[in-house]
C-alpha cells in the first residue's frame, strides 16, 4: 500500500508545493474551469454527496494535480494519490479502493497508462461503487462482490486520446486545461515570488512569463533558477527584466521560451526538407516519442511553429524566420 499510494509528483512539483494555492479563489487562470468547479463542488457539498468523477486533461504543468488537491480541500475530504504506471496488478487497485472512506478523492495521475485489466475493474467501481473479485481458479472460480464507499475519482492525463471510450465516458466532469496567457502567468509569478520572499519588479515578472511557454510549472521553475542567480550575483536583490533576460539566456531559454531541446527538434525537421514522421524524429534526437508528443510539440503547435500532417511534421515559415533571426540556422 505504501508504494502505490506514494506521491507521484516529481521533485520539481514537490518544490512547488509551498507555492500551490489551496482554494479555488486563490487559483490563477483557467477562469471558466474554476467557475464551473465552484458550482460542482458546492452542489455536491450541499447535497452531502460525493462529487461526480472528474477527468483533467491538457498539456503538462497547467495545474491538474493542484486542482485535484483543491477539490479535496474544498470538499473537506481525504485525498489519496497514485499513478497509472504504479497500478500493475488488480490487487494494487483493490487495496486502494477498499481503504477509501466515503466521499474521499482518489487521484490517479497518468491515467492513460493504466493497463486494460485494471481499467475494467474501475468500471464497476466508478458506476456502482462495488468491486468484483474472482475467488478461486478454474471451474471452482466464483465472483465475490465487495461494496465500496461512494468516492470521487479524479483522473489526470496529458494524452486523452489514449483513454478508452468506456473509461472516458464514465467521467461526468471532463475538464480541459489550456495554456496560460502572459498576464495570467505574470500574476502566478508575482504570487510565487511573495511566497518564497523574493523581490521582483512587474517588468521582471512579465519577462519570465513571456518565456514560460504558457505553463505555470515552467514559470515557477524559471523563477527559482533566476532567484539563484540573483542571490549570488545581483547586489540590488531584485529581479528586473534586464536581469531576468540575462539569467534566462544563461539557462538557454530564448525570447519565445524555446530551449535547446526545442531548437534541436526544429532544426532536425528543417534539415529533413520534407514532412518528418515522429519515429524518425525520435530516432534522430534519441528522444522518447511520448516526451516529444507531450512536452515538446504542444507549445510549438500553439505558436504555429510546426504542423502535424498525415505525412509527418512540417516546420512553418514562422519557425524558420525565428531560427534565422536567432542565428540557429
From Swiss-Prot:
Its EC number is 3.6.4.-. Homohexamer. Forms an RuvA(8)-RuvB(12)-Holliday junction (HJ) complex. HJ DNA is sandwiched between 2 RuvA tetramers; dsDNA enters through RuvA and exits via RuvB. An RuvB hexamer assembles on each DNA strand where it exits the tetramer. Each RuvB hexamer is contacted by two RuvA subunits (via domain III) on 2 adjacent RuvB subunits; this complex drives branch migration. In the full resolvosome a probable DNA-RuvA(4)-RuvB(12)-RuvC(2) complex forms which resolves the HJ. The gene is ruvB. It catalyses: ATP + H2O = ADP + phosphate + H(+). PANTHER family: HOLLIDAY JUNCTION BRANCH MIGRATION COMPLEX SUBUNIT RUVB, PTHR42848. Gene3D superfamilies: 1.10.8.60, P-loop containing nucleotide triphosphate hydrolases, Winged helix-like DNA-binding domain superfamily/Winged helix DNA-binding domain. This is Holliday junction branch migration complex subunit RuvB. Residues 181-252 are annotated as: Small ATPAse domain (RuvB-S). Belongs to the RuvB family. Its main location: cytoplasm. Residues 255-329 are annotated as: Head domain (RuvB-H). It comes from the Bacteria. ATP binds at residues 20, 61, 64-66, 127-129, 170, 180, 217. It comes from Ehrlichia chaffeensis (strain ATCC CRL-10679 / Arkansas). Keywords: ATP-binding, Cytoplasm, DNA damage, DNA recombination, DNA repair, DNA-binding, Hydrolase, Nucleotide-binding. GO terms for cellular component: cytoplasm; Holliday junction resolvase complex. One of its GO terms (molecular function) is ATP hydrolysis activity. Pfam families: AAA_lid_4 (PF17864), RuvB_C (PF05491), RuvB_N (PF05496). It is found in: Cytoplasm. The lineage of its organism: Bacteria, Pseudomonadati, Pseudomonadota, Alphaproteobacteria, Rickettsiales. DNA binds at residues 308, 313.
